[in-house]
Regions:
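Membrane-embedded alpha-helical segments that form the functional core of polytopic membrane enzymes
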Residues: 25, 33-58, 123-136, 176-196
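C-terminal ends of transmembrane helices
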Residues: 2-4, 56-59, 79, 133-146, ...
Length: 253
């Protein structure tokens, strides 16, 4: 039971709702369509959670072995930092969750496309592999992109674009402008969450050479950057919502 609690701590359960936000929005856009699949929707939720757990394990591992998670770090203590799991055990956890995520992703892809289009199958399998790489490479490796100020871009891409547009396309086999705008909105909200965490960790990140966007910008500009992200996210989200209301009443009246 104690070991299970340690793995739950490493999985960072409070981060999981954010990981499924794009999936929820992408599928919500498809709910009124006759070919909407609840099976595909549930699979997408499990896949998104799996990718987030991979990222959390890898984040713990990468920051731990680089010394970023040290006694000066503000925020919750990590399992590797506390010695609750060894590097080897945590690495095995990353490998295991990567296999789980890829198996679930392949199941989703073949259920969604069957033999309709091998091009779509190949593209989405490639995207799944890339997603695993991105989840791990944020902090792991000599060229970890989270240490080069690229974390914000990847969060926008995966939490927004891949999550919302991927969910929408898997359900309907097409794309739309509302889906694109909402993908940007969810992406900006997600980058905002990352930015808040990086603002909290700014001093320690700068000291250990982790060049996040906040470290590049400085505290004052990072706050302005955060306001811009939130304003854009809200405008896009509300804009899509209001346009749908206008279309609804215009159609019925």
């Amino acid at each position: 039971m104690q070991q299970f609690k340690i793995w739950l701590s490493a999985a960072r359960l409070r981060t999981l709702p954010l990981s499924i936000s794009g999936i929820l929005v992408g599928n919500a856009l498809c709910l009124n369509q006759p070919n909407f699949s609840w099976v595909l929707f549930v699979l997408m939720l499990f896949i998104a959670i799996s990718f987030q757990i991979i990222s959390n394990f890898a984040n713990d591992y990468g920051d731990g072995i680089k010394g970023t998670d040290n006694e000066n770090r503000v925020g919750p203590k990590r399992v590797l930092q506390q010695g609750l799991l060894s590097k080897e055990v945590l690495k095995n956890g990353i490998i295991f969750m990567s296999l789980v995520a890829l198996i679930l992703a392949c199941t989703l892809i073949f259920l969604a496309f069957e033999s309709q289009s091998w091009l779509y199958i190949i593209v989405f399998i490639g995207l799944s592999i890339f997603s695993v790489w991105a989840a791990i490479s944020y902090t792991v490796g000599d060229k970890a992109y989270g240490y080069r100020g690229l974390g914000d871009l990847f969060v926008l891409l995966f939490f927004g674009g891949v999550s919302v547009l991927g969910a929408y396309f898997i359900q309907l086999k097409t794309l739309s402008f509302p889906a694109f705008y909402l993908a940007l909105s969810i992406g900006f909200f997600s980058v905002g969450v990352l930015n808040l965490n990086n603002m909290r960790d700014q001093a320690n990140d700068a000291a250990v050479g982790k060049k996040t966007m906040v470290v590049f910008l400085g505290a004052k500009r990072a706050k302005m950057y955060h306001i811009i992200l939130m304003v854009l996210a809200i405008i896009l989200f509300v804009g899509v919502f209001l346009s749908n209301i206008i279309l609804f009443f215009g159609y019925h009246f």
